[in-house]
């Protein structure tokens, strides 16, 4: 199935002074739970006219795993797989203050396929100090087991709506608030995981993982960015999440950044803390009467109570014009990520190291 790894990093948002740009970067994630993910990506954005831009990108996740999830499921030797993803999009600005964007996002691997669509609208008010956006997303996925006929794969559908507002409070401060409502319907368990059930008779049986087929998610995020001086910038944010599986989480983050004159070089440090409770049907150990099974059962550690911390350093350097380009910028980031599971018997925690290196050429 598709392995959704929360790689807690992103390439620096490089300043865009040109209308077209090409980007390439590679990310590497490795933890002490024997999971390694290498993720290359290339992207191109091209201006067709003053009002229309097009973009295209390719990305991949090259995964090698022998983690606890794998070793306790039906793949005792671990696995290696590659996920591919494409993006094709167009942005239209009929007026300087108005933006419409449309993207198509297909992804595929040997046991998962997805076709996604996203639509974004944006409008700037009050001399462009207030920006409101509305994001609409939908995806149509198919989930199966490697080697299984696709006719036996199961469906998973998603729709989401996300309004957001950002406000330039003064020349030093920008604040934002965003909300997302998401609904998923279909197969949401792992076709590989099996859950041990302790019968009261003393026998332990193993049953396929089974999750509810309906899930509604809510997320509210607040953020602020403040210029402490012409060189120093601070940022902070908070996100609250709650869903119909009674799982809730809290995320807080903060960052500090220094920029040289004309932002030719930028360095920064970021920290993030996360805590979540467990889903209503999740149990570390399940018990049942002989011959019966719990209606819903899970061996997914990401549905258990857990907390994590992340800290990272990042840097960005502008090289100026190179060959036919107007500017080339190189960015790097390194992070350490600690996660601790409070109610997952096979694994108490894991530590990961994350590195990313990339470049953007503007032309």
Located regions from the model:
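Short glycine/proline- and aromatic-enriched beta-strand/turn motifs that initiate or cap beta-hairpins
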Residues: 17-55, 337, 349
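Membrane-embedded beta-strands of outer-membrane beta-barrel proteins
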Residues: 24, 42, 86-88, 119, ...
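Transmembrane beta-strands of outer-membrane beta-barrel pores
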Residues: 26-32, 60-64, 106-110, 125-127, ...
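Outer membrane beta-barrel transmembrane domains
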Residues: 67-78, 182, 188-223, 242-253, ...
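Outer-membrane beta-barrel "beta-signal"
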Residues: 121, 172, 313-315, 351-363
């Amino acid at each position: 199935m598709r392995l959704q790894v929360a790689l807690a990093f992103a390439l620096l948002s490089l300043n865009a002074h040109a209308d077209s740009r090409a980007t390439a970067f590679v990310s590497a994630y490795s933890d002490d739970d024997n999971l390694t993910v290498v993720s290359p990506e290339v992207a191109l954005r091209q201006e067709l006219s003053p009002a229309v831009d097009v973009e295209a990108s390719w990305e991949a996740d090259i995964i090698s795993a022998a983690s606890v999830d794998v070793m306790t499921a039906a793949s005792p030797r671990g696995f290696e797989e590659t996920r591919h993803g494409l993006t094709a999009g167009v942005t239209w600005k009929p007026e300087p203050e108005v933006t419409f964007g449309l993207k198509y996002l297909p992804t595929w691997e040997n046991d998962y396929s997805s076709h996604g669509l996203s639509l974004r609208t944006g409008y700037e008010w009050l001399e462009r100090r207030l920006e409101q956006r509305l994001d609409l997303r939908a995806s149509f996925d198919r989930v199966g087991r490697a080697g299984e006929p696709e006719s036996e794969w199961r469906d998973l559908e998603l729709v989401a709506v996300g309004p957001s507002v950002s406000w330039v409070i003064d020349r030093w401060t920008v604040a934002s608030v965003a909300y997302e409502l998401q609904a998923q319907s279909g197969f949401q368990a792992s076709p590989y995981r099996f859950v041990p059930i302790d019968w009261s008779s003393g026998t332990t049986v193993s049953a396929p993982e089974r999750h509810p087929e309906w899930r509604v998610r809510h997320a509210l995020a607040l953020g602020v960015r403040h210029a402490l001086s012409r060189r120093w910038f601070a940022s902070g944010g908070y996100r609250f999440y709650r869903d119909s599986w009674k799982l809730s989480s809290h995320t807080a983050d903060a960052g500090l950044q220094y920029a040289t004159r004309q932002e030719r070089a930028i360095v920064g440090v970021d920290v993030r803390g996360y805590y979540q409770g467990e889903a209503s049907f999740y149990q570390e150990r399940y018990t049942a009467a002989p011959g019966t099974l719990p209606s819903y059962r899970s061996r997914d550690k990401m549905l258990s109570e857990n907390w994590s911390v992340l800290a990272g350093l990042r840097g960005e350097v502008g090289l100026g014009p190179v060959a036919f380009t107007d500017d080339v910028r190189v960015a790097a980031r390194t992070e350490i990520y600690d996660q601790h599971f409070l109610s997952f018997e096979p694994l108490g925690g894991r530590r990961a190291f994350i590195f990313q290196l990339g470049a953007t050429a503007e032309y």
